Amino acid sequence: MPSIRLADLAEQLDAELHGDGDIVITGVASMQSATTGHITFMVNPKYREHLGLCQASAVVMTQDDLPFAKSAALVVKNPYLTYARMAQILDTTPQPAQNIAPSAVIDATATLGSNVSVGANAVIESGVQLGDNVVIGAGCFVGKNSKIGAGSRLWANVTIYHDIQIGENCLIQSSTVIGADGFGYANDRGNWVKIPQLGRVIIGDRVEIGACTTIDRGALDDTVIGNGVIIDNQCQIAHNVVIGDNTAVAGGVIMAGSLKIGRYCMIGGASVINGHMEICDKVTVTGMGMVMRPITEPGVYSSGIPLQPNKVWRKTAALVMNIDDMSKRLKAIERKVNQQD
């Protein structure tokens, strides 16, 4: 279990210490579950009333909240960002052994950097290049001529097809598949003819991809994921999609082929986005959005009907179904009124 003096933690976080710097911090916890040795954080002033009951040894907070502190405190401008950084310092995620498992199968032509870890039953095919400090989890497959940059980690059972490029310091969670064939077929009088997918997937640096996500290889050009992109679990990213730097994609999103998404976008969970179009930089699509047309202006976009009691929803649905007829009737009334005038 990691531990650190509160004063040392404050220094690493560039935080202002209030209280005993010799307190030993052994973990991060929520305000409700924290006990002695824990540090917690408060983002919203509405939680001030809970400080009296909080058992944490220290709390991260803003200057405005400091008068309400009942324990040692670290004062910062952005408590949530500080929480992320201190969680990294006190991370308890198991670290892999820096070795090659006896059951791993590694082709003689593969190139491995220093301190590479390859787990049990992993397969590394010919021409693969693994950078320094790369971690390949148990049961992973890395196909021919793929490259994985320094410091990147694949959790167990990740599949990387051939000719894929993954940048430095990337994290890919279990059961994700990178580089499977895109959904490309031509129709010959009712019969589907497969189109070989000859492109690649190019993933930038500092990209994180959740579990059970699929990113298809390009048909001719490449599927490209920019630097700093974060993608949640169970997303489908089709062939030739391009996602700009630092865009965030929440769980269950489906992106059709040849879609281009700009930088600094946020795509809400379970959204569906049409292909062969562009979304500009700094667009937010709220959850379950259905994007059928290009978006050319930054902003927040939504679609669909929010949850309602069933009886209310049925009435709303009926109105929507009849809106065309109502529009025609309204225009007819307007014409009559105009004629009378």
From Swiss-Prot:
Family matches, as InterPro entries: Hexapep, Hexapep_transf_CS, LpxD, Trimer_LpxA-like_sf, UDP_GlcNAc_AcTrfase_non-rep
SUPFAM superfamilies: Trimeric LpxA-like enzymes
Enzyme class: transferase
A GO MF label: UDP-3-O-(R-3-hydroxymyristoyl)-glucosamine N-acyltransferase activity
Keyword Repeat recorded: yes
GO CC annotation: membrane
Pathway: Glycolipid biosynthesis; lipid IV(A) biosynthesis; lipid IV(A) from (3R)-3-hydroxytetradecanoyl-[acyl-carrier-protein] and UDP-N-acetyl-alpha-D-glucosamine: step 3/6
Catalysed conversion reaction: a UDP-3-O-[(3R)-3-hydroxyacyl]-alpha-D-glucosamine + a (3R)-hydroxyacyl-[ACP] = a UDP-2-N,3-O-bis[(3R)-3-hydroxyacyl]-alpha-D-glucosamine + holo-[ACP] + H(+); UDP-3-O-[(3R)-3-hydroxytetradecanoyl]-alpha-D-glucosamine + (3R)-hydroxytetradecanoyl-[ACP] = UDP-2-N,3-O-bis[(3R)-3-hydroxytetradecanoyl]-alpha-D-glucosamine + holo-[ACP] + H(+)
Enzyme Commission numbers on file: 2.3.1.191
SS bond partners: none
Keywords of the record: Acyltransferase, Antibiotic resistance, Lipid A biosynthesis, Lipid biosynthesis, Lipid metabolism, Repeat, Transferase
Pfam families xref list: Hexapep (PF00132), LpxD (PF04613)
Domain of life, source organism: Bacteria
Effect of residue 291 to M: In SS-C; sensitive to hydrophobic antibiotics and compounds
One GO term (biological process): lipid A biosynthetic process
Note: The SS-C mutant is antibiotic supersensitive; its outer membrane permeability barrier against hydrophobic antibiotics is severely deficient.
Complexes and interactors: Homotrimer.
Function: Catalyzes the N-acylation of UDP-3-O-(hydroxytetradecanoyl)glucosamine using 3-hydroxytetradecanoyl-ACP as the acyl donor. Is involved in the biosynthesis of lipid A, a phosphorylated glycolipid that anchors the lipopolysaccharide to the outer membrane of the cell.
NCBIfam families: lipid_A_lpxD, PRK00892.1
Protein name: UDP-3-O-(3-hydroxymyristoyl)glucosamine N-acyltransferase
